[in-house]
């Protein structure tokens, strides 16, 4: 990995380009692997309610390692942390390829993702500063969503051809991410020399949680992003069951095409947020959050493919406009109070706890036999109400 004493804070520095490429490949692997592994579960006749369990073991790793990964990101050069984390993802994907239980392999990928996330977002504040940070977040989100778009489609299409080919493509993507990480400059650790006593680390993490929760702005950001990503992951699994019921289509590819529409929309929404929203005007994003739930409700009632595509793209636009300013707000305020790595680790805990809760409720609803269309209607209505309540609370405080 190259050494760098002076950091070029340009939005298009070599270091930033390497981060964006590594993020794209890593996120591509994550999303292709999800749909490839779902196809594997179908081929091996796992029950439908087990599909969300796959994502639950993934996010469970985030929650389990949440007290430690922020300190890891702040104690070492973040580029090296990202490279190690992508190596773990590569190992997990390869293990599924070689016949290891898919839930175990996917858990290992989750451990890698848990270590990767604080480093990938924390490094943005080290490679660029000030007004460029929101734009850097926009680039990161755009790269991520482009990877979701292409990775999801690739996973579904390749799985329709051959599941093993789809799994191998995921492993190759993770390998490419490891190589891209080599070109990230070696920056000084943000907070070196911290204690590695697990009890002290847990206590320190809880202190970071408390500090961020007591601050009105960071609490607002944590709740908003947690609701968004919890809902987003649940929507992905909802689509897998909704497509054959509402549209009468039973292949692996169609749900990935529909997910791709959300991804395209988020790219557009993220770009709009970077231009129209600043750290001082974050509340502008809240109406978009409410509209996400409203459009999900309308979408659940559709029975034609073209309106479904259009509505999912609109959901994505609203989502990108909603989440990018909240991410930037947390990074800026969190960097000054608890360190960027710890702030993102706390954010991951909130987001993944929301995912675990929402996926658990969704899996239970499927298990007890509630039809998927009423699930979608209730899901959209509850999300709109939750964001409305958050906005009212934010305006009062």
Swiss-Prot record:
Keyword check for Hydrolase: no
An example Gene Ontology molecular-function term: lysophospholipid:sodium symporter activity
GO CC, alphabetical: plasma membrane
Extent of the signal sequence: none
InterPro entries: LysoPLipid__transptr_LplT, MFS, MFS_trans_sf
Principal localisation: membrane
Transmembrane annotation, as ranges: 18-38, 53-73, 91-111, 145-165, 167-187, 227-247, 257-277, 281-301, 305-325, 344-364, 367-387
CDD domains according to UniProt: MFS_MefA_like (cd06173)
Keyword Transport: yes
Keywords linked to the UniProt accession: Cell inner membrane, Cell membrane, Lipid transport, Membrane, Transmembrane, Transmembrane helix, Transport
Gene3D superfamilies per the UniProt record, alphabetical: MFS general substrate transporter like domains
Periplasmic side: 1-17, 74-90, 166, 248-256, 302-304, 365-366
Recorded topology in the membrane: Multi-pass membrane protein
Cell location: Cell inner membrane
Top-level division of the source organism's lineage: Bacteria
Segments on the Cytoplasmic side according to the record's topology features: 39-52, 112-144, 188-226, 278-280, 326-343, 388-397
Similarity remark: Belongs to the major facilitator superfamily. LplT (TC 2.A.1.42) family.
Function recorded in the entry: Catalyzes the facilitated diffusion of 2-acyl-glycero-3-phosphoethanolamine (2-acyl-GPE) into the cell.
NCBIfam families: PRK11195.1
Protein name as catalogued: Lysophospholipid transporter LplT
The organism of origin for this protein: Escherichia coli (strain SE11)
């Amino acid at each position: 990995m190259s050494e760098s004493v002076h950091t070029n804070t340009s939005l298009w520095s070599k270091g930033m380009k390497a981060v964006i490429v590594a993020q794209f490949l890593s996120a591509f692997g994550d999303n292709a692997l999800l749909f490839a592994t779902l196809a594997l579960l179908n081929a091996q006749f796992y029950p439908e309610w087990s599909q969300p369990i796959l994502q639950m073991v993934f996010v469970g790793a985030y929650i389990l390692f949440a007290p430690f990964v922020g300190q890891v990101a702040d104690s070492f050069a973040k580029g090296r942390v990202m490279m190690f984390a992508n190596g773990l993802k590569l190992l997990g994907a390869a293990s599924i390829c070689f016949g290891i239980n898919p839930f175990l392999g996917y858990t290992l990928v989750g451990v890698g993702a848990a270590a990767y996330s604080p480093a990938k977002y924390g490094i943005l504040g080290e490679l660029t500063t000030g007004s460029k940070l929101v734009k850097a977040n926009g680039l990161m989100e755009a790269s991520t969503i482009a990877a979701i778009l292409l990775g999801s489609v690739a996973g579904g299409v390749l799985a329709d051809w051959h599941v093993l080919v789809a799994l191998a493509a995921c492993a190759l993507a993770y390998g490419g991410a490891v190589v891209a990480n080599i070109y990230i400059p070696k920056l000084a650790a943000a907070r070196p020399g911290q204690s590695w006593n697990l009890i002290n680390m847990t206590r320190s993490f809880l202190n970071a949680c408390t500090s961020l929760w007591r601050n009105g702005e960071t609490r607002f950001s944590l709740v908003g992003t947690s609701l968004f990503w919890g809902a987003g992951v649940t929507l992905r699994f909802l689509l897998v069951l909704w497509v054959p019921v509402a549209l009468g289509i039973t292949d692996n590819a169609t749900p990935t095409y529909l997910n791709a529409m959300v991804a395209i929309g988020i790219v557009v929404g993220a770009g709009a947020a970077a231009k129209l929203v600043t750290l001082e005007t974050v509340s502008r994003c809240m109406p978009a959050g409410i509209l996400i739930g409203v459009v999900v409700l309308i979408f659940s009632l559709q029975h034609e493919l073209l309106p479904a595509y259009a509505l999912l793209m609109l959901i994505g636009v609203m989502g990108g406009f909603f989440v990018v300013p909240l991410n930037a707000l947390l990074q800026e305020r969190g960097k000054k109070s608890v360190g960027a790595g710890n702030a993102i680790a706390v954010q991951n805990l909130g987001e993944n706890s929301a995912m675990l809760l929402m996926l658990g409720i969704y899996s239970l609803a499927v298990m007890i036999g509630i039809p998927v269309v009423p699930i979608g209607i209730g899901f959209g209505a509850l999300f709109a109400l939750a964001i409305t309540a958050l906005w009212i609370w934010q305006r009062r405080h």
